[in-house]
Amino acid sequence: QQWAVGHFM
């Protein structure tokens, strides 16, 4: 889940 990197960060 690379989207999580920009979503939580």
Swiss-Prot record:
Residue numbers carrying Methionine amide: M9
Modified-residue entries (Pyrrolidone carboxylic acid), positions: Q1
GO CC annotations, alphabetized: extracellular region
Main localization category: secreted
Compartments (UniProt record): Secreted
Oxidoreductase among keywords: no
Keywords: Amidation, Amphibian defense peptide, Pyrrolidone carboxylic acid, Secreted
Example GO biological process: defense response
Expression by tissue: Expressed by the skin glands.
Family: Belongs to the bombesin/neuromedin-B/ranatensin family.
Protein name: Litorin
